[in-house]
From Swiss-Prot:
Example of a GO cellular component annotation carried by this entry: nuclear body
GO biological process, one term: primary miRNA processing
General function of this protein: Acts as a mediator between the cap-binding complex (CBC) and RNA-mediated gene silencing (RNAi). Involved in innate immunity via the short interfering RNAs (siRNAs) processing machinery by restricting the viral RNA production. Also involved microRNA (miRNA)-mediated silencing by contributing to the stability and delivery of primary miRNA transcripts to the primary miRNA processing complex.
One example GO MF annotation: nucleic acid binding
Cross-referenced InterPro entries: Nucleotide-bd_a/b_plait_sf, RBD_domain_sf, SE/Ars2, SERRATE/Ars2_C, SERRATE/Ars2_N
UniProt protein name: Serrate RNA effector molecule homolog
Gene (name only): Ars2
Residue spans of biased composition, Acidic residues class: 447-459
Biased segments, Basic and acidic residues type: 8-20, 32-66, 296-307, 319-374, 414-426, 433-446, 460-513
Origin organism lineage: Eukaryota, Metazoa, Ecdysozoa, Arthropoda, Hexapoda
Family: Belongs to the ARS2 family.
Chain spans, region Disordered: 1-84, 296-518, 645-669, 868-893
Species for this entry: Anopheles gambiae (African malaria mosquito)
Annotated compartments: Nucleus
Length: 967
């Protein structure tokens, strides 16, 4: 009786298992200790990667479960190497070498089923190598494939005509499918929808006009002329850009004073909680010394208080001295009930204050002076109260005096302290949990001075809380107490001093309500890495508006490589706790999409240098010409200077002569009303003494070509160029020296964040051909700004399948007119029945006019998409670009390309544009023939030099062998 399937698999797996053990050799079957371990786990190998195969496939006669021999590759013996482990697998985790080229058996023997490191391949062996997420159009039929579908009697001209029609119809179908797939997405509507696109254009035009107003304001104030676009002038450039941002945010001249403050001060005012924790750790080493100093000061204050008490009042007994100490304890500690631990609590309170960063000696002096005055007043009140009541004990006298003084302070603060200080004090009475809650909500973190004033407010808040507890019992006593007037004066002085100390702490990153300077150019932002195409900007704004300090949202255009996912930037005010907000956003899924929120760092280098050759006079003159063309082209695109704007009413007579006429000629100084382009042609004309050189026989050009020339700066030309560069950067968001445009910059966290400037010039001579090559290269990079957007004409649009609005309306009416029976028609939109189709038509126009209007808008929507010459669409299939009959040429280039960049040769006859039939880390090919001139595995040379072909000769076997005949 034959073995079962399980027994067969067990024997086959255990055949070489002992030889692959970690011991390295010996008779594995002689070791009885290892056998039980192997037999126990041989039936269940969880880390086994190789798929199980039916052992019947190895038998010569075909069985019922075997595959066709034509659809399966030959069985190849696997090769063992030094890298094989005890489990019979390659150490990299790739598949065993059972297949043709290191792959497992599949329905097709040469199918790549497993990729490097055991990953699955996403492409067929005959499909071109593309990324897994890349989407392409379907493969179009070749001419040969198309002719196979046609009649054999078709002529050549008809075949070519029909094939061209097929290609055109294929393009129509692909564009229509792309439109239907993306027409409901926000980014697509912003580009082509008749209503959404118009709103977007108006919004962008308002941004441009606002930027233009700010630029003209700075131009009139001569702020633009003071700045040169050089990398050595970084501070002035950054100040100008920050000034523009503050003015765009609606800032005033008071807000511009923030730019005059050193960055270190601004950074100290905008510290994060992590920074405060670091500073707190640094100051812990100084806590003990500060506590000792404060203890000495408080002892001196207590001694002064005792002497002043002796002078102002009758000498008191030991109870009065203890009464005075209790007043000191009242001001320094939060607890009032423990009278036996006055010294310990005063020291602990001092240490607590020093831990909260007591930074300024002046602030401490003011605080101690107020405490001295308060103690003197309380000692007087304590002495008078103790002398008036003789029947009660000393402890009861102390409690009564404390309650009376508290109530006096409360009444005085309610009368004298302004309304704003009341609100701040009431807010400070919250406990630690509420304070943590405020931090979670994103409120700003105070600096060292704010911590000092907050500490004082905490003490006052504790006093107010205790005063409220005894309010009912002491109200009558305080109203009849003659000491109230003196206490009111002292508390009034104390409140004024506290108000002065609060006014000294100003956080520059905050937005104060009293109209102080605001750092509007500094923001905090969060970067959203993944936004599904279905997520709208309004949804992101609604999600982020719940957090304090929210400003705006910017969403980029989708990318094909990222499956049309978009990226977003959420901008907040500078003082918010941006990390807490980012953590909350990471816990939110919007439309079942993880946002991938991370904190966006500040810009590292805002002014970046470029080649120093840009300072040369020849290059500057070329850049002026190029920049003037770009500025004129962008102004004409948005229509900024077509009509006389109010901001540029006094720019000169040249702008008034033209009125609102628009002429297509590119005449900069005469036809443009832009003040930057006025009289710019005077600087574009080059002057040279050509006649003098000709008469004298001089040849300056030949000297320049042979010897080169030093970089020469022309300050007048550079001033004109800088004005152009700053106009493009501020108004149109075009970084001239970086030859790029920063899109949707008005919604980004950093407006006018980066600019490229001229670097330091070289001290060596520059050849003329180098200058011309630089100018030519720079013009090529800026060519995209010089070409005007031209829409497709009507004839081409009809070829691409442009729709007619009236025809589509008729189709809509026909589709919604259904005949039920004779003289019985139905309108499916409303469910009403009519006697004829004309009545249904009239009903649709009257009752469903909005549906008809939607059809017209849909037609305009689609036509706007077709009209765009740079419309987004899926890339063509790589197989469409392949020319038929070029397989021989591509195979040669394939071998060259793989030999240069690959690890081993491609399979024979494979093109370089297709995926190889073996994985990068799989077993090497054992059956593919090698190209000529390369050694194989079993041939001489060991993959060394060329292996020469044997000489072919012919010999008659019946003839005798000649002595010089070679074999």
């Amino acid at each position: 009786m034959g073995d079962s399937d399980d027994e067969y698999d067990r024997k086959r797996r255990d055949k070489f298992r002992g030889e692959r053990s970690a011991g390295g050799g010996g008779d594995s079957y002689g070791r009885g200790a290892d056998r039980p371990d192997r037999s126990r786990g041989r039936d269940d190998w969880p880390d086994r990667v190789r798929p199980r195969q039916d052992y019947r496939d190895y038998r010569p006669p075909p069985r019922d479960r075997g595959y066709s021999p034509a659809r399966e590759g030959p069985t190849v013996k696997r090769m063992r190497g030094d890298t094989w482990g005890d489990e019979g697998r390659h150490r990299f985790g790739a598949h065993d070498g059972y297949g043709m080229y290191g792959y497992a058996h599949d329905h097709f023997g040469m199918h790549p089923t497993v990729g490097p490191y055991g990953h699955q391949h996403a492409t067929h062996q005959r499909e071109p190598v593309v990324s897994g997420d890349m989407q392409t159009q379907p493969c179009m039929m070749t001419l040969k494939q198309f002719l196979a579908t046609q009649d054999d009697s078709i002529s050549d001209s008809d075949a070519i005509t029909k094939y061209n029609e097929y290609k055109l119809e294929f393009r129509r179908q692909q564009m229509n499918e792309f439109f239907v797939a993306h027409k409901d997405e926000e980014w697509f509507k912003i580009k082509y929808h008749p209503e959404e696109s118009q709103k977007r254009k108006e919004e962008q035009l308002s941004f441009l006009k606002r930027r233009c107003e700010v630029f003209l304001e700075l131009l009139k104030s001569k702020e633009i002329g003071k700045v040169s676009v050089d990398a050595s002038n970084t501070d002035a450039l950054l100040r100008l850009l920050d000034t523009v941002v503050i003015k765009l945010e609606g800032g005033t001249e008071e807000d511009l004073k923030v730019l005059d403050i050193k960055p270190s001060v601004v950074e100290a005012a905008a510290r994060t909680p992590a920074t405060l924790n670091e500073e707190k750790v640094k100051t812990e080493s100084k806590v003990d010394a500060t506590a000792k100093e404060l203890a000495v000061k408080m002892e001196e204050d207590s001694s002064k208080q005792e002497t002043e008490t002796d002078v102002l009042s009758v000498p008191q007994s030991e109870e009065d001295a203890r009464n005075g100490n209790s007043k000191i304890k009242e001001e320094l500690s939060k607890s009032m009930d423990d009278g036996n631990e006055n010294g310990d609590k005063s020291k602990s309170n001092d240490a607590q204050k020093s831990e909260k960063e007591i930074a300024e000696v002046e602030h401490e002096a003011h605080k101690h002076e107020s405490e001295d005055r308060k103690k003197r007043s309380r000692s007087d009140s304590g002495s008078s109260s103790s002398s008036s009541s003789s029947s009660s004990s000393s402890e009861s006298e102390e409690e009564k005096d404390e309650r009376m003084n508290k109530e006096d302070n409360e009444d005085e603060e309610n009368m004298r302290i302004p309304e704003e200080e009341k609100k701040s004090d009431s807010a400070d009475t919250m406990d630690n949990i509420n304070r943590d809650k405020e931090v979670d909500e994103g409120k700003p973190v105070c600096d060292a001075e704010d911590l000092n004033t907050a500490d004082d407010r905490d003490d006052n808040a504790d006093q107010n809380k205790e005063q409220n507890e005894f309010e009912e019992t002491t109200k009558d006593k305080n109203s009849s107490d003659p000491v109230n007037d003196e206490n009111k004066e002292n508390s009034d002085k104390k409140s004024q001093q506290e108000g002065d100390s609060k006014a000294e702490t100003i956080d520059l990153a905050k937005d104060p309500a009293d109209g102080g300077s605001r750092a509007l150019h500094r923001t905090s932002s969060i970067f959203l890495r993944n936004l599904a195409p279905s997520i709208t900007k309004a949804e992101v704004e609604a999600m982020c508006r719940r957090y304090n300090g929210f400003l705006r949202v910017a969403i980029a255009d989708p990318l094909l490589e990222r499956r049309w996912f978009r990226r977003g930037w959420v901008t907040f005010k500078r003082e918010v706790n941006i990390k807490e907000i980012c953590w909350n956003l990471n816990n939110i899924r919007l439309r079942d999409c993880e946002l991938g929120a991370i904190v966006n760092k500040d810009l590292s280098r805002r002014v970046r240098p470029v080649n120093g050759i840009t300072c040369h006079k020849t290059v500057v003159r070329s850049d002026i010409k190029l920049g003037a063309k770009i500025a004129h082209n962008l102004d004409d695109k948005w229509g900024l200077w077509k009509e006389t704007p109010t901001a540029a009413s006094g720019t000169g007579e040249a702008g008034d002569k033209n009125g609102s006429e628009v002429q297509p000629e590119e005449s900069f100084g005469l036809q443009s009303k832009n003040p930057v382009l006025q009289n710019i042609t005077d600087y574009l004309i080059e002057e040279a003494s050509a006649e003098e050189e000709e008469l004298l026989g001089l040849s300056e050009d030949s000297k320049k070509v042979s010897e080169g020339e030093l970089i020469e700066r022309d300050p007048q030309l550079i001033e004109v160029l800088d004005r152009l560069i700053l106009y493009l950067r501020i108004v149109h968001s075009v970084d001239f020296y970086n030859h790029c445009e920063y899109p949707y910059e008005d919604e980004m966290p950093n407006r006018c964040g980066i600019i490229h400037a001229r670097g330091p010039p070289s001290q060596s001579k520059v050849m003329s051909n180098e200058i011309q090559e630089y100018i030519r290269t720079f013009e090529g990079k800026m060519a995209s700004f010089l070409t005007r957007m031209v829409d497709i004409d009507e004839t081409d649009m009809k070829k691409l399948g442009a729709k007619d609005a009236e025809a589509e309306v008729e189709k809509f009416i026909t589709a919604n007119t259904q005949e039920l029976a004779k003289d019985k028609w139905l309108c499916p939109l409303s469910g009403k029945k009519f006697k004829g189709p004309d009545f249904v038509r009239k009903h649709i126009f009257n009752k469903h006019a909005e549906k008809v209007e939607e059809v017209r808008k849909e037609v305009e929507y689609f036509n706007n998409y077709l009209k765009d010459s740079k419309r987004p669409q899926l890339p063509e299939h790589p197989g469409n670009a392949k020319k038929p009959g070029s397989e021989g040429a591509t195979s040669a280039t394939a071998n060259a390309s793989v030999g240069a960049g690959g690890y081993r040769n491609q399979p024979f006859g494979m093109s370089h544009s297709y995926a190889p039939m073996y994985a990068s880390y799989a077993a090497a090919s054992m059956m593919a023939p090698n190209p000529r001139g390369r050694a194989g595995f079993g041939r001489g040379g060991r993959m060394g030099g060329p292996d020469y072909r044997p000489v072919i000769h012919y010999r008659d076997l019946d003839a005798p062998r000649e002595p010089d005949e070679f074999l």
